[in-house]
């Protein structure tokens, strides 16, 4: 019984931690993304996790404020840069996309994430 109670408390604690942030999840995203809404949705939280790396530790509010195509679509592969506002900082997150028969795929290069402004 103690083990179950401890597990339940741990899960509740993790749930609270996960929802302690405010993420803008409105789709379609602003800007010129050519990823469809489903691919944007699948990529959204991964992009936000990379924005956490550059945000201030006390930052709780995150929003994608722009998207742009940085490498044009060739053979169903392209790259976009998503601009994410994280409180007083703005970060650019480069995302490589690829469409295959089984669906869309994406990859983020962690070394490509950059802070572009800080207030």
Give the ranges of each region predicted by the language model:
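Cysteine-centric segments in proteins
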Residues: 20-119
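Sec-dependent N-terminal signal peptides
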Residues: 4-16
């Amino acid at each position: 019984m103690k083990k179950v109670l401890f597990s339940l408390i741990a899960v509740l604690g993790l749930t609270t931690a996960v929802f302690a942030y405010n993420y803008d999840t409105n789709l379609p995203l602003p800007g010129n993304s050519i990823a469809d809404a489903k691919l944007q949705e699948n990529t959204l939280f991964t992009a936000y996790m990379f924005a956490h790396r550059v945000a201030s530790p006390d930052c709780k509010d995150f929003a994608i404020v722009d998207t742009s195509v940085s490498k044009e679509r060739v053979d169903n592969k392209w790259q976009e840069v998503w601009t994410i506002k994280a409180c007083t900082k703005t970060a650019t997150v480069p995302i490589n996309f690829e469409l295959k028969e089984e669906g869309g795929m994406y990859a983020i290069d962690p070394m490509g994430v950059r802070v572009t402004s800080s207030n």
